[in-house]
Design a protein with these regions (language model features):
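Beta-propeller-forming repeat regions
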Residues: 15-211
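N-terminal Sec-pathway targeting helices
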Residues: 1-11
Length: 211
């Protein structure tokens, strides 16, 4: 009797656990200069986030991206890519674009207005397929570049992109013959982890280099 009860209780708890959601929250400044909390949610053990909640002191709006609107968010950064908005939200997504019908990693840039994500740039693709990205002011102009690790024909690239007027342009890059896995950075330095160890990322004469 007790054994069946315990088994039944365990099954119910396990199902509820599997159906529960995990979340991550961060703050962003909207177009009116007001602080907004952005929360991403996904089912436990799912790989990607597709539920976005935006909230301030008075209101809450939740957006669920599914079917043809699925985003599959795998990374997020906030920063300021140009002078058009107070702050930008940049998502790394894994989906199909209207003009590039292949599932792949992409970079989407949004601003926040009235608790809505306003698309600023949704890339069909960058120069080459990306494995990671971050925001970093690599040239010291006061605005963040979208810096991406790209892979093409066995080579690794670190490319920096500027976004303006609804388009994105690669302005700096470096080419490397070894595997580069991901970005890490603190307040001062942008670094990458590679098969040869960890290096800081630098820029000289418009060329990205590792030091």
């Amino acid at each position: 009797m007790w054994k069946k009860f315990l088994v039944g209780t365990f099954v119910i708890v396990f199902i509820l656990f599997m159906m529960s959601k995990e979340s991550v929250s961060f703050d962003v400044v909207d177009d009116d200069g007001k602080p907004v909390t952005l929360t991403l949610r996904k089912r436990r053990f799912q790989k990607y986030y597709n539920e976005v909640t935006l909230s301030d002191d008075e209101n809450v709006k939740t957006h669920v991206f599914k079917d043809k609107y699925t985003l599959n968010i795998w990374k997020w950064k906030t920063g300021r890519v140009n002078d058009e908005n107070n702050e930008d939200v940049v998502f790394g997504v894994y989906n199909i674009a209207p003009h590039h019908r292949i599932m792949t990693n992409r970079v989407f840039i949004y601003t926040v207005k009235d608790l809505e994500l306003q698309p600023k740039f949704r890339a069909s693709r960058l120069t080459y397929p990306i494995s990671d990205f971050t925001l970093y002011d690599i040239d010291g102009d006061g605005y963040d570049e979208v810096v991406a690790i790209e892979k093409y024909k066995g080579e690794s690239y670190i490319s920096a992109y500027k976004e303006y007027d609804l388009k994105i342009e690669r302005v700096y890059f470096g080419k490397f013959s070894f595997e580069i896995s991901r970005f890490t950075h603190d307040e001062e330095n942008l670094s990458v982890e590679t098969e040869k160890g960890k290096f800081n990322v630098g820029l000289k004469n418009k060329e990205v280099y590792l030091k």
